[in-house]
Amino acid sequence: MFKKIDHVEIVTDQLERTVDFYTDVLGFKLKARDRSDRSSLGVPLQLVYLELGGTSVELMAYEGGSVAPAPADEHLGYRMMALEDRR
């Protein structure tokens, strides 16, 4: 049985604008900020952790990077499931 969405990770090149949208428009609460000097891509990474109703959103911004918009005629979707046995 499905119980909840635990967390979602979103990569953005407009971190503060994205934080404002999630907090001011959607009502998420800011939980923490973090920064890693060297990410797996070899550049610094900024992280923002938000929460609403038991669901966390992790915003990630790679310093010096940009996120290109998808072409208008293209749809991109990801599906992933992680199961945890809590017996």
Residue ranges and their predicted role:
Residues 1-16, 78-83:
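N-terminal beta-strand motif that seeds the catalytic metal site of vicinal oxygen chelate
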Residues 9-55:
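Core segments of cupin and vicinal oxygen chelate
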